[in-house]
Amino acid sequence: MTENDPLRYSILASGSTGNATYLETSQHRILIDAGLSGKKIENLMSQIDRSLKDVDAIFVTHEHTDHCHGVGVLARRYGMSVYANEGTWQAMVNKVGNIPDEQKFIFTPNTVKEFGDLDIESFSVSHDAAQPQFYQIHHDNKTFCILTDTGYVSDRVAGTIRNADAYLMECNHDTEMLRMGPYSWPLKQRILGDEGHLSNEEGADALMNVIGDRTKEIFLGHRSQHNNMRSLAHLTVASIMEDHDFAVDQDFKLEDTEPETPSSFMVL
C-alpha cells in the first residue's frame, strides 16, 4: 500500500433504522447500502466533510428498507451507479422507483468485481430477503469486510472473510432482551432463526472464528433499538473474546456504531 492512497471508511449509520457505509480511495468513493432517506444521508456525509455528488456508486446488499431506502433518490439526484444482484433488483424495484438503465448494474453473488482501484467481493448470506449478499472491499492488500443481516455464519462465508484488516460485524440483539421484549412470537422466531440476525454472542463467536493477525479494527453493527444496548453489546463481545484469550483493544480495537451518527474516519 502506498502512503498516499489508503482505503478510508466511515460507517455513516448502522442499526435497525438504517444502514450506510462510505468508503474512499484517491480514485473512487462508494456507498455500501443507503438505508436512510436521501436527506439524512446527505447530512451524515456532511458530518464527515464529504459530498454525495462525489460518490460514484452504491452497492446494495438486499432489498430491506433499512438498506435501500435512499437508493433511488440518490441515484436520480446524483447520477450514481447502483450495483445489486438480480434477486435484489427484482425485489427492490418498487421501493427504489425508476433508475435509468445506464445506472443499473448486476453484481452476481460470490464474485469479485473490479471497480477502478477497488476489488469488491460479494458473498451470499442467510437472511429472509430475496438474494442477500454482503461485501468485502479490497484495496492494495487491505480488506474491509461488512457482514450484518445473517442468521448464521456458514463455513463457506467464514472461509471467505477470514483475516480481514477490519470488520463491521452484526451484533443485533441480546437474546434475553429479545425473548422478554414486546415483539410478537413470530417476529422473535424470525430474528432468532437461521434467516434472521446474529445475537451479541453469535457475533462474538463469528469474530473469533474469522479474525487473524491482520485484523486491527472491529465495529459492532446493526444493533436493535428495542432488543439491545450499546454497552451490553460491547461488554458481551469483549468478555467472550477475552475469555477465549483474545487481547481486545490491544491486538485490535473494538468499536461501536450508531444509528444516526457516523463513525470517525478509519484508515487502512
Predicted regions and their residues:
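Metal-dependent catalytic neighborhoods of phosphoester/phosphodiester hydrolases
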Residues: 69-78, 93-95, 228-235
